[in-house]
């Protein structure tokens, strides 16, 4: 118990950053404005607000002027909420909505500052080389390739519903000392009517944020998960026979872009004070690995089913006693890796078992040795991607391409750019699939949807439109995968583009999940 308390004392000092004055700095709103316009490949921000870039900048300047007025924060948010239900003019509705969005985004940027500074100093202290590569989502998969083939069981964990808002603010007080800023946080959480969109529904494996307060609620959710994972880090380190450096490296990555291992959990100390030392022997396993993204987590182990069951109920008890809410045990599923495929980060992952027979000759005797090898395999779930395209109105549920009417008012170059960017992003994100044939079906759907959208705009048929402008018009914006790979790999390498559809490539520059993958 003393060791746990000493572990917590290392990080007992609070953050001394006073954040509230930053709300009156113009550059904060400029950062929020840039983030809002560039946050989605679907240009959701521009479509939601109904403004172009120029008029949005004008609104930002108007907001900065109003922010100095008395009770401006309260009036702006209340106006935005009331205008949803009360008849107001079109301009007033979008103005209030835009102001509320900008304040929310700016507030989120400010509250992330102490955590970002802490993360940078942490990696400098640890002297972690190339830690920026750990920001990539794809960096998780080489880790799984190396580890999962030697493990037996995997637990699929759905992180439970978010806790009460006041508990989140109280936890945040351990990090931020600025009292006015914390009061403003309470105001945001209690006033926004779209708080329910932040909840994780039982039917979905990922959490859903409202379009208007996405960054704020993402920050709150990340902080909540950060709190959940702290005790797991501590117990895992104390119970491990082998102090592997890779464990710290890969578990630290998920605090916004990395996970920091220190946090105060004083409430839980009282609960586990009597049983803490007796608990450690339950979890002793040198081959246990944990990865998480969004509302899912995977805990894999070489141990027995009994060990995984004990970890399962440990998580349930921790959520119950520390966060004061009950988590159903059915949210954690234990499966044997050899007979199980799991969906994670847009890939359908499994262990392939390959058996090979080798004839061995010793003097006059010969015998056959059967060798069984396991390989971590990742493929693209084409059906789920088609479902995402259907939700985004690019095709029907059966995969038949349709036009995108909402984009028909854009210029031809903008339409081509949007479709081409989505297609290239999908190929880039799913470059780690061992079977890429399904991606070419997705590419066909997007290309034909683009052609139908252009034909709809010009009041023509697809065949007539392509005959008049030529099919090469679409080829220019849908870069073939082989062309991209030829730029990445020099000609002197043994990498053959002919077999590129079977090669798995992981990129270290992907720091956010693709929007279409996020919809599935």
Curated annotation (Swiss-Prot):
Keywords: Chloroplast, mRNA processing, Plastid, RNA-binding, tRNA processing. GO terms for molecular function: RNA binding. One of its GO terms (cellular component) is chloroplast. The keyword RNA-binding applies. InterPro entries: Domain_X, Maturase_MatK, Maturase_MatK_N. It is found in: Plastid, Chloroplast. The keyword Nucleotide-binding does not apply. One of its GO terms (biological process) is mRNA processing. Belongs to the intron maturase 2 family. MatK subfamily. Usually encoded in the trnK tRNA gene intron. Probably assists in splicing its own and other chloroplast group II introns. HAMAP family: MatK. This is Maturase K. It comes from Leucojum aestivum. The lineage of its organism: Eukaryota, Viridiplantae, Streptophyta, Embryophyta, Tracheophyta. The gene is matK.
